[in-house]
UniProtKB/Swiss-Prot annotation:
It comes from Mycobacterium tuberculosis (strain ATCC 25618 / H37Rv). Belongs to the mycobacterial PPE family. GO terms for cellular component: peptidoglycan-based cell wall. Induction: Highly up-regulated during the early stages of invasion of the human blood-brain barrier. The lineage of its organism: Bacteria, Bacillati, Actinomycetota, Actinomycetes, Mycobacteriales. Could be required for host endothelial-cell invasion and/or intracellular survival. PANTHER family: GLUTAMINE-RICH PROTEIN 2 (PTHR46766:SF1). This is Uncharacterized PPE family protein PPE29. It comes from the Bacteria. Signal peptide: none annotated. Coiled coil: none annotated.
Length: 423
């Protein structure tokens, strides 16, 4: 291509509309990065080779070093070539920038051509002939300038493109052993394990569609004697889940269904001990009436109904089906609907007991105290009830003298208050 034959519009247009130095700059950066990596790899190989010829010196290390040394030399030479390639790319960039600066900008060329058209259009009497000639001379200078810039750019680019050809890496393997390696690979592929592995994958591919097809078919179309494998697997899964739900350490295993009625029955019996325990505590402990901050307890005891009849055994336990009692709209056991007798006044009951009876009551009346203790929260609906022995009643004659000595002492008592629940 002869740049002198091209007008400045073409040469300048090519320089200004091209991609610029960006692609060449990216190439130079890539060559520099490749050179750095090759140098680092070659240095690592050289370090390993020095170790082979040092503490690990021997026939094997010598063979390995002799095989790897040519490859290390090739990497070092290639790294140098990559550095040269990056430098040459930067030379090309410099050549482009110089040619771009020497090229006439396209707007200047366009203005010259527009001025020429105006001068020619107004040159009626030839008065614009000198100006036309001057304009043409400027255009020719632009032509020559662009041609010279393009010639210089071509020469600089040719110099920058001169590079030493890269060589292929040396062969570091023994060609004579490649045949033996291929035979060993073929023998391994022909073994039973290799054959099983190769046949298992096609079987898997064919088994999956068959299983899906079996799931898609109706159950009646299958043979009654032949059970599909996936059905057997589902049966095993159900067996496993059944053992997990009904095993010996699950809730049904620890508490079988036969124990549930027992729990319900014992709850019905224990619930009858509620109100009587409050009566035993408020009516049988202490030697003086309740006064002061605890005075409201006497009023509370007067209005707290206690169900049951006299005696330690309490009400009889009955069982039946379909004959539950009703408290409002709530179904309850039959014993819960027995009328609650009036509780005696704690003030009168406390007069019969002395503080001196408390030590003996700790041993004699412990059973009565615990027997009347409330074992549920239904204080107002406790079953017809058990009456505990008065605490200290059996020991009163033995400690009468001591009781007289301490009659005036302040009475101390631990009182457990269980509020009555609304019906």
């Amino acid at each position: 291509m002869d740049f002198g034959l091209l007008p400045p519009e073409i040469n300048s247009g090519r320089m200004y509309t091209g991609p610029g130095p960006g692609p060449m700059l990216a190439a130079a950066t890539a060559w520099d990065g490749l050179a750095v990596e090759l140098h680092a790899t070659a240095a690592g190989y050289a370090s390993e080779l020095s170790a082979l010829t040092g503490a690990w010196s021997g026939p094997s290390s010598t063979s390995m070093a002799s095989a790897a040394a040519p490859y290390v030399a090739w990497m070092s030479a290639t790294a140098v070539h990559a550095e040269l390639a990056g430098a040459q790319a930067r030379l090309a960039i410099a050549a482009y920038e110089a040619a771009f600066a020497a090229t006439v900008p396209p707007p200047v060329i366009a203005a010259n051509r527009a001025q020429l058209m105006v001068l020619i259009a107004t040159n009626i009497f030839g008065q614009n002939t000198p100006a036309i000639m001057m304009t043409e001379a400027q255009y020719m200078e632009m032509w020559a300038q662009d041609a010279a810039a393009m010639y210089g750019y071509a020469g600089s680019s040719a110099t920058a493109s001169r590079m030493t050809a890269f060589t292929e890496p040396p062969q570091t393997t023994n060609h004579g052993q490649l045949g033996a390696q291929s035979s060993a690979v073929a023998q391994t592929a022909a073994t039973a394990a290799g054959g099983n592995l190769q046949s298992a994958f096609p079987q898997l591919l064919s088994a999956v569609p068959r299983a899906l097809q079996g799931l898609a078919l109706p159950t009646a179309s299958q043979s009654a004697s032949a059970t599909p494998q996936w059905v057997t697997d589902l049966g095993n899964l159900s067996t496993f889940l059944g053992g997990a739900v009904t095993g010996p350490y699950t809730f049904p295993g620890v508490l079988p269904p036969s124990g549930v009625p027992y729990l319900l029955g014992i709850q019905s019996v224990l619930v009858t001990q509620n109100g009587q325990g409050v009566s035993a505590l408020l009516g049988k402990i202490g030697g003086k009436p309740i006064t002061g901050a605890l005075a409201p307890l006497a009023e509370f005891a007067l209005h707290t109904p206690i169900l049951g009849s006299e005696g330690l055994g309490g009400g009889s336990v009955s069982a039946g089906i379909g004959r539950a009692g009703l408290v409002g709209k709530l179904s309850v056991p039959q014993g819960w609907t027995v009328a609650a007798p009036e509780i005696p006044s704690p003030a009168a009951a406390l007069q019969a007991t002395r503080l001196a009876a408390a030590p003996i009551a700790a041993t004699d009346g412990a059973g009565a105290l615990l027997g009347g203790m409330a074992l549920s929260g239904l204080a107002g609906r406790a079953a017809a009830g058990s009456t505990g022995h008065p605490i200290g009643s059996a020991a009163a004659p033995a400690v009468g003298a001591a009781a007289a000595a301490v009659e005036d002492l302040a009475t101390e008592a631990n009182i457990f208050v269980i509020p009555a629940m609304d019906d």
